[in-house]
């Protein structure tokens, strides 16, 4: 068995070589963290979708004070380089991630994707998942989807807490966060700034989606605990504001939508065994709402109530999870993996 400890403390010539694909908000954050961990990893390539960034130094694209000597390029050019891992930060969906992932594994590289659906990809894309698994095994590499949510807070962390139970009867977990730092696209997909009627129309038309990843998390939990659910029920309701709220991208008056309360329930014999909630809104403090991550597990002889206040930061958390899983993905058996197949996550320092 390969020593995980050895991978965690690797130095010098044993540094993991990494290519980052996608230089948006998350990809740029991952690139910065990789550069900060130069004693553990070496960034050998960076890929941007926009061709006007190609040929530029990564340090300039990231607006760093120094150049890195790494030229931003196309995916094909980056994959021609020797690397241990490619981190993909370009999309939320398996169908959009699939083609590039096949190119990555075809070049003999392990892949970490932060696409939310990739955390448990067979739920929405069973055929593509089978293709990815076959390609990874053929090329003796591993594919993993991860992030802070899905990937950690509302699935991996929940399951870790069940380890102290004789028997689990029910799980209720919620993540309450502030949307204010996010941009226009997130405001649109969460329905912020709409009227109640506009919100409901957006739900019907699919322009207001709420949280991407709930189906992955609830199925991951159920599979890990051996629960065969009868049905999974999702609801998305508008969070109406009683006060005026404002961000650089949207203004919300009283009676308008300040966010989306997205809930998913895993049902067995008419009972909700798993309930996951993700109410997201701008400036929740204006109505006295505390942000945080909350997990309640009921067992046959004990219960656990865990609260993290404020919530684990979504951006920083996802960036960290992508980087922290590098040594585990490098050491993992070939194939398409999930967080259920990995050692418990920890800081890669």
Label every PLM stretch briefly.
Residues 2-62:
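N-terminal Rossmann-like dinucleotide-binding module
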Residues 21, 162-287, 291-293, 307, ...:
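Active-site-lining helix/loop region of Rossmann-like oxidoreductase modules
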Residues 50-81:
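Conserved N-terminal Rossmann-fold NAD(P) cofactor-binding segment
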Residues 79-85, 94-116:
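Rossmann-fold NAD(P) dinucleotide-binding segment
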Residues 90-91, 277:
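Short glycine-/small-residue-rich Rossmann-like dinucleotide-binding loops
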Residues 91, 109, 115-119, 148-149, ...:
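Short, ordered loop/turn segments at secondary-structure junctions
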Residues 116-140:
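Rossmann-fold NAD(P)-binding glycine/threonine-rich loop
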Residues 282-349:
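C-terminal helical cap and adjacent loop that interface with cofactors, partners, or active-site loops
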């Amino acid at each position: 068995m390969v020593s995980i400890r050895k991978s965690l403390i690797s130095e010098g010539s044993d540094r993991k070589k990494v290519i980052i694909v996608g230089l948006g908000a998350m990809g740029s954050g991952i690139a910065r963290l990789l550069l900060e961990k130069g004693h553990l990893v070496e960034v050998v390539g960076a890929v941007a979708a926009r061709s006007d960034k190609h040929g530029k130094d990564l340090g300039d694209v990231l607006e760093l004070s120094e150049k890195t000597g790494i030229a931003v390029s196309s995916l094909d050019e980056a994959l021609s380089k020797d690397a241990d891992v490619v981190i993909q930060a370009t999309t939320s969906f398996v169908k959009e991630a699939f083609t590039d992932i096949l190119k990555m594994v075809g070049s003999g590289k392990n892949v970490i994707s932060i696409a939310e659906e990739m955390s448990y990809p067979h739920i929405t894309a069973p055929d593509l998942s089978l293709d990815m698994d076959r390609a990874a095994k053929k090329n003796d590499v591993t594919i993993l989807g991860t992030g802070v949510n899905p990937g950690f807070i509302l699935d991996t962390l929940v399951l870790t807490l069940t380890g102290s139970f004789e028997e689990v009867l029910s799980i209720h977990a919620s993540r309450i966060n502030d949307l204010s730092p996010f941009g226009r696209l997130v405001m649109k997909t969460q329905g912020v700034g709409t009227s109640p009627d506009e919100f409901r129309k957006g739900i019907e038309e699919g322009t207001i989606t709420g949280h991407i990843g709930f189906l992955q998390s609830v199925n991951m939990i159920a599979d890990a605990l051996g629960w065969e659910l009868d049905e999974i029920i999702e609801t998305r309701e508008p969070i109406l504001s009683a006060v005026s709220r404002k961000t650089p991208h949207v203004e919300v008056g009283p009676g308008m939508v300040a966010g989306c309360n997205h809930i998913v329930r895993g049902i067995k014999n008419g009972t909700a065994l798993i309930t996951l909630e993700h109410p997201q809104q701008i400036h929740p403090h204006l109505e006295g709402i505390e942000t945080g991550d909350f997990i309640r597990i009921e067992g046959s002889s004990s219960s656990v109530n865990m609260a993290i206040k404020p919530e684990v930061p979504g951006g920083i958390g996802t960036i960290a999870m992508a980087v922290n899983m590098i040594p585990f993905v490098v050491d993992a058996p070939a194939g398409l993996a999930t967080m259920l197949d990995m050692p418990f996550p920890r800081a890669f320092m």
